[in-house]
């Protein structure tokens, strides 16, 4: 049974403020099983002043550019923010496990409010999602450790067929479409018969798109 890939978007993070910060691996930040593999949201500690400067609510992104051979590669990590006023201004503490992802335990990075992140969840641990529909809201804390509510906006199955909000049920169907999701017309009035999924999450769904609701 494949994992659910839950895509989380923050609708209030439109043009996030980017600030250069110092990042340190700290024993004060515990590693979480699965954080390096995208199966858990790692923790980052910042002080209240830095949190407000970044206009961060719950999630923070750190980004660096690394030289790999003749190419420059961006490395990003998304973190759940924990306020700790013992952390100096413009500094972020992360776990040693996440520091390995960036290739250093002491480095500079751009920090900003997270726009989108993806996390993989074992379907056996997320059985409460099966049967939910597009538009439903669920608590993310118990499932992925984030103290937020998530609203389901869509998704797709393991063949890439998208869920449609206006088709009842979980079954795969072939219907006539005039617009997305499932079909993007090139001309006004163009319609095509396409395969889609209904609006209900089943075990065949592999990606669930959500937004944070407040």
Swiss-Prot record:
Can you tell me which family this protein belongs to? Answer: Belongs to the eukaryotic ribosomal protein eS6 family.
Provide the GO MF annotations for this entry: structural constituent of ribosome
Name the gene behind this protein: rps6e
Q: Which domain of life is it from?
A: Archaea
Protein species of origin = Saccharolobus solfataricus (strain ATCC 35092 / DSM 1617 / JCM 11322 / P2) (Sulfolobus solfataricus)
A GO cellular-component term linked to this record:
ribosome
Identify the InterPro entries for this entry: Ribosomal_eS6 (IPR001377), Ribosomal_eS6_arc (IPR020924), Ribosomal_eS6_CS (IPR018282)
Which GO terms fall under biological process for this protein?
translation
From the Swiss-Prot or TrEMBL record, give the protein name: Small ribosomal subunit protein eS6
Q: Please provide the record's keywords in A-Z order.
A: Ribonucleoprotein, Ribosomal protein
Q: What Pfam families does its record include?
A: Ribosomal_S6e (PF01092)
Record flagged with keyword Cell cycle = no
